[in-house]
Amino acid sequence: LDPEHASAHHHRALLLLFLGDYESGFSAYEWRWRDPAHLARQPSLTSSPWRGELMRDATLLIYPEQGFGDTIQFIRFLPRVAERVWKVIFWCSGPLVPLLRQAPGVDLLWEGESPSPEFQIHAPLMSLPTLLRQTRDRIPGVSGYLPEFAWEKPSRDRSSFLPLRVGLVWRGRSTHRNDCNRSLDLAWFEPLLNLDFLPWVSLQEGAEREIVEHSRWRERMECPDLTDFAVTARVI
């Protein structure tokens, strides 16, 4: 037995979160930093870590540490963070930038490869529930956590589609270590894709989009040009 086994504590945290014990689960989730693989994602920063205290004269840098989906889910906590510090800088890059440019609680969206130099404290995004001491009944954004930003207009007119339209994502990032349990071949959805009354929308880009465009389902599945997550949100 190893009471300090980081991976065991990490999986225990996930189980607690699954059971709805958010306070204990998020607290236990801090064990992820004992995992060398996860620790490698932590940027080299010389500022002090923020502990959730009131610091009205300090600028806080918040950095994402995991995937796009985790970032989108956890930005809901930024307005509450903004109530405790003078200024919030969110370090972000890539296709999420257009989506988060007007996110509530963010004073500056930093897009550089290295962190902005103008901050005194820092915190990882996924630690915010613990730092804010969130319980299940205090989680913000339960009815929608992405306000209406300045969405890009969709590339095609959607008026010709029926009221019920189904967006489909069938593959994740191939480099993910659990990709074998997260991704499927499009052919698995054949019984549903063959239903004439059901219009589909592909929410995939890259090679998966090309697969649809060269498949027999092309006529019944719209493939909008999803250049970034703001466009995707607008399509949804």
Residue ranges and their predicted role:
Residues 1-236:
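Alpha-helical solenoid repeat scaffolds of the TPR/TPR-like class and their adjacent stem/linker regions
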